[in-house]
Every structure is written in structure tokens, then in C-alpha cells.
Amino acid sequence: MSDLDRQIGQLKRCEPLSESEVKALCLKAMEILVEESNVQRVDAPVTLCGDIHGQFYDMMELFKVGGDCPKTNYLFMGDFVDRGYYSVETFLLLLALKVRYPDRITLIRGNHESRQITQVYGFYDECLRKYGSSNVWRYCTDIFDYMSLSAVVENKIFCVHGGLSPAIMTLDQIRTIDRKQEVPHDGAMCDLLWSDPEDIVDGWGLSPRGAGFLFGGSVVTSFNHSNNIDYIARAHQLVMEGYKWMFDSQIVTVWSAPNYCYRCGNVASILELDENLNKEFRVFDAAQQDSRGPPAKKPAPDYFL
């Protein structure tokens, strides 16, 4: 059994790797990711997944429902880390699968794959707690800079974490972005990771998130038409039912973190596409283990007995 297969087995038991193993894994991943396009081409059949947010046991549930990688070809649309209790194990497992089966799993960047955001929403603190230094956080956030910004399935389905940008009319314009950097505060790259579709907006609107834009149905129609795509698949927004179509099925939100933050009570979904791009949503609930909330603390030693 190779080192990598052993590490994958270990991560599937939610046991983190050593710091030196993380460093080596990230270096291997970098070599693979640097070759990918800003608009990564993906073949069907493929299963599309939305936000995971460090909910490791729920991701294990996702693999139970959707099948193991590499048997199933997966596309994860970002936000692997933050908010959940197991961002380290979640991200490292996905990264190890990417290194082991590069053609069977595609990882695109979400707005939480950023140094600034992870210092606020949990991943940085988790790395510090589990490793005693920020080195692992640094190795992982360096990898974030290499991740693709979007993907296109069979030239027909455009997949992105957040949404569209007023600076982007065509997929070719996305291809020209220099992605190997921290997510900027504004501009095309920021918008792709931060924007949201909104019913009550026609055209473009200001986003309450403070980054990206709100965009309406007419924007989606013209983007899809210009790029000859059938619809957009994206994540980024909690959907209580696990998925949600908008604008006459021109865009779909897929959300893959059930009982988000261990308290929202939502279901999650993944979108399975067969070789002819026929769609099947698989809806699933939180894993039993994870519905209990935070990981059990090891009992404190009984010094006083």
C-alpha cells in the first residue's frame, strides 16, 4: 500500500496527518493544480457538490450517498473549510483524493479558500489547535491560490462557487485572470467567488455580503446564451431543501452541508449528471455522529483523585 493510500485511509477515519505529511501532500497537489485551467474542463458523468464547511462526517455521508471516489467522478464547488469542526481533515482528504485520482475529482475555489476569511471563521484556529503552529494553515492556504476558479461540464454546464461578474461576459475572459493570488476584495475573481443570484434584482445590485454582486435573471440569460451553456451550477448559499432552481432553470444552487453549523436543520444535496447530462438530485441528512455537535473532548486527567 502506498503512503498516499495509507494517508487516505487515515483521513477517512478523521485522523489528521503529521505536519511533514501535510507539507509533502500540498507540494504534490500544487504540481497538479498549477496545470489546471481557470475554467477546468470536466467530462460527464460527474457528481456536483456544494459547500462542505468542515463537516467531515456529513461529507462521509455524501460519499455514502454518491459513491466513493474514484468510482464516482466528483466536482466540489468550493468552501471546504471554516465553521465546521473538522476543516483540517475535510480539506486534507479532498486534497489527498485529488493527488491520488487527479482525473476523478475536481476542486474549485470558494470564497472561504482565502487567508483572510479563514482567520475569522475557524480554519486558522483549528490548525493552531491541532498542530500547535500556523504552518499547516500556511501550506493549505498556499494551495488555495492554485485552485481553479470554475469548471465547465461537457461545454454545457458552467460551475462556479458564487456567481457572475459585471466584468465577465465570456468564459474566455475568466481564462485570462491571474488566479494565483489571495482572493481580491473586488474585481472579476472576487465576484465569481462571492456573487449571488437574486429574484428581486434585474441586472446588477449591491451585495449585502460586502463583496461580489447580486445578479438577476436577465444577466443569467445573456451569459448562458453568449457562452452556449445550458445552465449555471453554483453553491455559496444555504438552501433548506438542499438545492434550488432559479430563473426558469437557468441556474441552480447546490448545498451539501446538512444541518449547517450543526443547527440550521436543512437537508443537503448533490447533483448527479449522467453521460447525457440527465440530472438527478440526491438529498441527504446529517450523519448521526455529526448531529451531536462538537467533537467529544478527551476527559481531563483526574489530578486530584
Curated annotation (Swiss-Prot):
Annotated active site: H112
EC number, as in UniProt: 3.1.3.16
Source organism (scientific name): Arabidopsis thaliana
Chain's gene name: PPX1
GO CC list: cytoplasm; cytosol; nucleus; plastid stroma
Keyword line: Hydrolase, Manganese, Metal-binding, Plastid, Protein phosphatase
Cited Pfam families: Metallophos (PF00149)
Domain of life from the UniProt record: Eukaryota
Coarse class of the protein's main subcellular location: plastid
Disulfide bonds: none
Reaction catalysis annotation: O-phospho-L-seryl-[protein] + H2O = L-seryl-[protein] + phosphate; O-phospho-L-threonyl-[protein] + H2O = L-threonyl-[protein] + phosphate
GO terms (BP aspect): reciprocal meiotic recombination
Compartment list: Plastid stroma
Subunit structure: Interacts with TAP46.
Cofactor: Mn(2+)
Distribution of this protein across tissues and organs: Ubiquitous, mostly expressed in root mersitems, flowers, and vascular tissues.
The protein, known as: Serine/threonine-protein phosphatase PP-X isozyme 1
UniProt binding sites for Mn(2+) 2: D79, N111, H161, H236
Family: Belongs to the PPP phosphatase family. PP-4 (PP-X) subfamily.
